Amino acid sequence: GKTTVVFHYPAGSERLVKSVNLVVNRLLQQRLDMEQEIDTLTHTATFTFDICGPSSAFTFTTKVETLLLLTPGETVNVYVNPFSDAVRVRNTHFPNHKLQTVSKIHADGYYAAFNNYANNERLRNPPSMDVWYSDLTDYKASDEEYVRKIKEKYRKIMSDLESKDIPLSVKEYYEYQIKNETVMAFGNAYYLRKRNYRTVHKVKDGDIPFKFTNLPPALLSEIDSLFDMTDPRLLEGGNAEYLIYGVNDSDSDWESVLGDRGKLLYDLKDADLVYIPRIK
């Protein structure tokens, strides 16, 4: 459906920002990368485009970087305060004379609760499987130990997330993000353990005295005991690219595990994704 996003800027902000760049991930369609000048009379920048399902978008060259979730057919108004970062920086340097913090944006629309929280709040210790830097992907672990550690960490993080007092839409976003990261950990056991070895031993190049492999189908299938990785709602969460890459770029034998259930994920092999910053 045709979706419209209108960015509203306060009068006088043209000294700080002249235009808005908006990038939209559309998964089954080509990624959009658009730019609009801010109208000097209305102080707005309007984008209209087609999306076929819930899509993530962000701005990255304005004074305020925003992360948005959008749904087809809606009009979303985003009221931007380009001075919010200046207040944050000032308060950092003058902690004894802090100004009242101000919201970066105020948005309406279907995902209003999520978009306002994601851009204005700061969750301490945001949940993550942290597949790149934790000991979760310990190179010394056997395949069975590797899977056991993943499952234990997944269950602990999901339990912690359930206890957090945050909007439901934000909780779901994190839930799907954690699941996407878990797919990455299952599907890329070879690469992640090899990377862990190089990190631990500070070895960038050269041979490694370990033979790393991906998980066999019997262990890959244990992900089914955690969640349904073919649930299309996972694409609405953070790190959706982990779900796609964890299946299509891993050389793991997912077809033996998923069969026809994985058709959507296979079809997304060439999805034109761009990095979306995680909620801070």
Task: Enumerate the language-model features and the residues they cover.
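Oxidative protein folding and maturation machinery
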Residues: 91-280
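A non-transmembrane, solvent-exposed segment enriched in polar/low-complexity residues
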Residues: 1-168
